[in-house]
Swiss-Prot record:
Belongs to the chorismate synthase family. This is Chorismate synthase. FMN binds at R125, S126, S127, N241, A242, G285, K300, P301, T302, S303, S304, R326. SUPFAM superfamilies: Chorismate synthase, AroC. Keywords: Amino-acid biosynthesis, Aromatic amino acid biosynthesis, FAD, Flavoprotein, FMN, Lyase, NADP. The gene is aroC. NCBIfam families: aroC, PRK05382.1. It comes from the Bacteria. Reduced FMN (FMNH(2)). Pfam families: Chorismate_synt.
Amino acid sequence: MSFNTFGRVFTFTTWGESHGPALGATVDGCPPGVALDEGWIQQFLDRRRPGSSKFTTQRQEPDRVRILSGVFEGRTTGTPIQLMIENTDQRSKDYGEIAQAFRPGHADIAYHLKYGIRDYRGGGRSSARETAARVAAGGVAQAVLRDLVPGLKIAGYMVQMGDLHLDRANFDLAEIGNNPFFLPDAGAVPAWEDYLNAIRKAQDSVGAAVEVLIQGCPPGLGAPVYAKLDTDLAAAMMSINAVKGVEIGEGMAAAALTGTANADEIRMGNEGPRFLSNHAGGILGGISTGQDIVVRFAVKPTSSILTPRRTINRKGEEIELITKGRHDPCVGIRAVPIAEAMAACVVLDHLLLDRAQTGGRRGTIG
């Protein structure tokens, strides 16, 4: 299996399976001299950690990260950074029944048709467990961005879960860390809790939509025509398990707008160009404009549910299957810190790529 590496200049390669002894990431292209320790990375992993609330999988993994190389006396050396996270709470016996059967909605059948062999324990490499390594790599990216672009902030949050939608009139980023849904509306949390509790009691799951807001991104990032910033952000989000669609700015809603309504008009401000709206989501022509970058994606419902489902086994026999194990009733919740990590890696990769391509030179106005 190839294609386990992400990025061009700042890269990471993830390794490991859901029920293996460990998983991790090898980060390359990190500049030297950046302050970095395990505690810094751990704060990001703790936001994604399974078992952190009753609304996520009850698999209890501490997700303690170890830095094995690339850091000396608390600073990066410019050499590859090896990160490792041990798996401690595998229950492979829960997956014995699917050794020969294909779970509907999962990657089981696709992996079998492609490779002829698969690790059926928790989905192996196709499991969302792999994303712990991405979040660790994203922590490294966040450390570099902290030094290179001090004003940059990346915030992910849920905007939809099933029939429930975020009321943007009550939007407050300060609330994201105060509830299990990463919801920027404190008043809506009880309704979201009741809704997901009902889904859980029905032994079902539900989809979601997540938004990532990137504030303070400098203008000029993105390399047309085949390394556009929005192209890479979309690819990063689509690489996350269960993501089925990505939007930038207005996204699909732009199909219902006129050119008059959609075009972001520009005026001249005291500090340069000033946009009167942000339908483009902070990116034009594949290049950042300096406005807030807005990325939104849809997450399908968890395919692992306790409702009997029709499927087939490796012999081609038609069977009925109940998926056992510990699973998220809404994978959109833990997709939030994963998306933040992927966004950080994309922005840093483009920042370093831009410095190599342009030397930091910029056009001027006025």
